[in-house]
Amino acid sequence: MRSANEISGLVLKAARGAGMALGCAEELAHAAPSLARDGVFDMIVDLLEGPFEPPVLKEGALIGGHPVLAIAAWIDLRAAGRDPTLEHSVSPFLINAMRSEAFPVGPHDVSEQTWERLLAYAERTFVPETDASRLAGAGAGLTDND
């Protein structure tokens, strides 16, 4: 069982580690607890496979692109008073989770296999520890008196 904050925090780091732009990674992280609540959290790992291409708006339709980017563009265009169609095969769970203002608190069941795969993506954002970085002031040093 994982809290909503644990889920969103890890999904944000994993999406950034996968190469997703910060704003889209934040959108996916916000949607993640809803996906966990709905029992479809495992889809997030598939969503971290690139490329993270934007959709194309052509004749009132959003065509192609990565599902997260396509849904985000669709939501933004609708908020701006336009009514585009979404020409992309995406999960209705993902659309609803990204549109939702609610943030389900949890706890939520998340498979360990999915959690480990997300951790692997998140680890790509870590900076390697070196003696030079420690000498330059990185880390807590020898004492941590916060």
Task: Label each region the model flagged.
Residues 1-54:
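Long alpha-helical, hydrophobic tracts
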